[in-house]
């Protein structure tokens, strides 16, 4: 709940006699506001309505930011534009960003003001109380002294004599820490200013005293860094009465854009000084005094004639600039609103439909969630899941594993046949264990032992592949659960538990089948026709190879080499058939147990959850952050929907 207090009027300000000059000045201001209303009011109404909707939470809206070096007179410029006395003095005066929202009332309506910061909202009944309330707010936010804060203070002013406008007063740039300020005060202030002036929707008013070298001004340098072309930067020279005699022509050159070029150029104003305030010079009188100053000044008179001097001319210029800037920003603003709307809609869609209040509908809702989950699992099993361009389907990953397995088998048997160790073993058998068989005959027992040993060596790699594939499938199923049940902590947790239990059982069953298959592979067997064909092809290839190598020359191979060659041919023939069998059968076992049966068991397990209707509410308990996120997205969509309607109405 916001704290609401009322700043009472303490005493009545001293009234000055109503002179004809003051009346003319006030009439000038009223005419200015009238022009402003005719030209800008429709645009400002649109932006204000968007701001009232809270669209600034989603994107930036057109505004005017006033920046300047410390004590450059920027607060005085805001004061002159708004008709409200703001904190002023030496050192850092603006210690928090001040959002000044001006609202024009009809003639005769009463002035009112409001200061809003954090959870505090203070009604102000008279302009003379504004400065005190701003100082109080700054002390509460940034603390007593000269520290700064990035927390906003909002000052709303409603008056017949102000235009509809939003201005932002930012802390003045300082270079040396004083008092209780942190050593990095300059960096903090610059970072705070940059957050505002870098937005393309912000017009930057760079305030520079007339009696300093503009080329060395830090404020102008910062503005040029974020706006190199000067498309949204206006230079404002202040304190022309403090210019040293003889340097007036240099000031004129600056205002005429001849020194430090800005696309939007410069203007010059003379606001109330400290002595004027002490003498209680009113803002209307200050405008008249400013007019007389420029009109009678021998060098600056020409700037008044060019429309580049005085606060009324500045206000008129800002009217045109802001109107143009808003119109220029509207297409971009409309596009940003549409993009943000689409993003929010897509994000909200991921959270799914709202949970029904009725119990029977809630059960139907849960059933639908589980059915969608089961369909997604089935799509994974059937290699029909929807994926992005950068992703790969689950079965594609498994197929790559199976292809790598087949390559591994071929490489394994190839190394076996070509290994010097195996040739040494066969030669040792020929030398030490050969029986009655004639040269060239293969000892079947030796042949069988070699086959068993090499096939056995493939068992652990097969199990390793099983574990890799199981992990892939488990992760894919878990991702489906997360996509479908991610907002429902209990349902997602239950699904993950089911996935883990079924994974364990199916992996265990697949491991038993793989080990059983390798036990069967220890029985050396092959269909006669297949084995004969493979052996014949191997012998023909080797004969062709020998023929091309030695030509017609027939050589007599030693007895040992003959037996070894024969054994190698038989091993090669058997490996071809055995390798095909293992290369096909192990992937089939894994697909059946880890993909197909796993998916079927998951479907059964999830449907069984519907049997216990008492747990329906428990399963559909949403995570608190999900609920808040959905509420946030719905509020954003409502804002953006209304913003789209207002923009469409404005365009029409």
From Swiss-Prot:
It comes from the Eukaryota. It is found in: Nucleus; Cytoplasm; Endoplasmic reticulum membrane; Cytoplasm, Perinuclear region. Residues 1-27 are annotated as: Disordered. Transmembrane segments: none annotated. It holds the Pfam family GED. InterPro entries: Dynamin, Dynamin_GTPase, Dynamin_GTPase_CS, Dynamin_N, Dynamin_stalk, G_DYNAMIN_dom, GED, GED_dom. Homooligomer. Oligomerizes into multimeric filamentous or ring-like structures by virtue of its stalk domain. Oligomerization is critical for GTPase activity, protein stability, and recognition of viral target structures. Interacts with TRPC1, TRPC3, TRPC4, TRPC5, TRPC6 and TRPC7. Interacts with HSPA5. Interacts with TUBB/TUBB5. Interacts with DDX39A and DDX39B. Residues 68-75 are annotated as: G1 motif. The C-terminal GTPase effector domain (GED) is involved in oligomerization and viral target recognition. The middle domain mediates self-assembly and oligomerization. Residues 270-273 are annotated as: G5 motif. It is a peripheral membrane protein. It comes from Rattus norvegicus (Rat). Residues 332-357 are annotated as: Bundle signaling element (BSE). ISGylated. Residues 238-241 are annotated as: G4 motif. This is Interferon-induced GTP-binding protein Mx1. Keywords: Antiviral defense, Cytoplasm, Endoplasmic reticulum, GTP-binding, Immunity, Innate immunity, Membrane, Nucleotide-binding, Nucleus, Ubl conjugation. Residues 564-652 form the GED domain.
């Amino acid at each position: 709940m916001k704290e609401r207090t009322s700043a009472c009027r303490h005493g009545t300000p001293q009234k000055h006699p109503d002179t004809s000059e003051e009346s003319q000045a006030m009439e000038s201001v009223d005419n200015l506001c009238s022009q402003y209303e005719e030209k800008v009011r429709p645009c400002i109404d649109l932006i204000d309505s968007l701001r009232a909707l809270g669209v600034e939470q989603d994107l930036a809206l057109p505004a005017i930011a006033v920046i300047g070096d410390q004590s450059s007179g920027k607060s005085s410029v805001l004061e002159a534009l708004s008709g409200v006395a703001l904190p002023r003095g030496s050192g850092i005066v603006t210690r928090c960003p001040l959002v000044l929202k001006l609202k024009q009332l009809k003639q005769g309506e009463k002035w009112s003001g409001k200061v809003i910061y954090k959870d505090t909202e203070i009604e102000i009944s008279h302009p003379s109380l504004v400065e005190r309330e701003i100082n109080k707010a700054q002390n509460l936010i940034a603390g007593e002294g000269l520290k700064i804060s990035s927390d906003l203070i909002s000052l709303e002013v409603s008056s017949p004599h102000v235009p509809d406008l939003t201005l932002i007063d930012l802390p003045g740039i300082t270079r040396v820490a004083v008092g209780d300020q942190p050593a990095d005060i300059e960096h903090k202030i610059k970072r705070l200013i940059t957050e505002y002036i870098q937005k393309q929707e912000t017009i930057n008013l760079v305030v520079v005293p007339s009696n300093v070298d503009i080329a060395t001004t830090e404020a102008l340098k910062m503005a040029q860094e974020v706006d190199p072309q000067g498309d949204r930067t206006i230079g404002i020279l202040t304190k022309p009465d403090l210019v040293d005699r003889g340097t007036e022509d240099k000031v004129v050159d600056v205002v005429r854009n001849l020194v430090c070029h800005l696309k939007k150029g410069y203007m010059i104003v003379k606001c109330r000084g400290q002595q004027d305030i002490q003498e209680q010079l009113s803002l209307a009188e200050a405008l008249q005094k400013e007019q007389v100053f420029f009109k009678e000044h021998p060098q600056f008179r020409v700037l008044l004639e060019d429309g580049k001097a005085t606060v009324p001319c500045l206000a008129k210029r800002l009217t045109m600039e802001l109107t143009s800037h808003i119109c220029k920003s509207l297409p971009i603003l409309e596009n940003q609103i549409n993009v943000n709307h689409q993003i929010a809609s897509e994000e909200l869609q991921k959270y799914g439909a709202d949970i029904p209040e009725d119990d029977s509908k809630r059960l139907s809702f849960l059933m639908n969630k589980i059915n969608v989950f089961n369909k997604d699992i089935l799509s994974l099993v059937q290699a029909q899941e929807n994926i992005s361009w950068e992703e790969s389907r689950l079965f594609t990953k498994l197929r790559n594993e199976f292809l790598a397995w087949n390559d591994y088998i071929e490489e394994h048997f190839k190394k076996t046949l070509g290994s010097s160790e195996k040739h040494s073993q066969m030669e040792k058998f020929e030398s030490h264990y050969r029986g009655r068989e004639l040269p060239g005959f293969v000892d079947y027992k030796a042949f069988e032992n070699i086959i068993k040993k090499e096939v056995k060596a493939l068992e652990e790699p097969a199990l390793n592949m099983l574990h890799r594939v199981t992990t892939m499938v488990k992760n894919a199923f878990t991702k489906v659960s997360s996509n479908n049940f991610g907002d429902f902590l209990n349902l997602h947790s239950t699904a993950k538990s089911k996935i883990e239990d079924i994974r364990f059982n199916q992996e265990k069953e697949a491991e038993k089948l793989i080990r059983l298959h390798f036990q069967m592979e220890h029985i050396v067997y092959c269909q006669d026709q297949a084995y004969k064909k493979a052996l014949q092809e191997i012998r023909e290839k080797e004969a062709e190879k020998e023929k091309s190598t030695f030509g017609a020359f027939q050589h007599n191979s030693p007895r040992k080499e003959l037996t070894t060659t024969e054994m190698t041919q038989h091993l090669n023939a058997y490996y071809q058939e055995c390798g095909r069998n293992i290369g096909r059968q192990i992937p089939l076992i894994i697909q059946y147990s880890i993909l197909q049966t796993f998916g079927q068991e998951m479907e059964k397990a999830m449907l069984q959850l519907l049997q216990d209707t008492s747990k329906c509410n428990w399963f559909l308990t949403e995570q608190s952050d999900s609920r808040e996120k959905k509420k946030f997205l719905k509020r954003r969509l409502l804002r953006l929907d209304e913003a789209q309607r207002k923009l469409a109405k404005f365009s029409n």
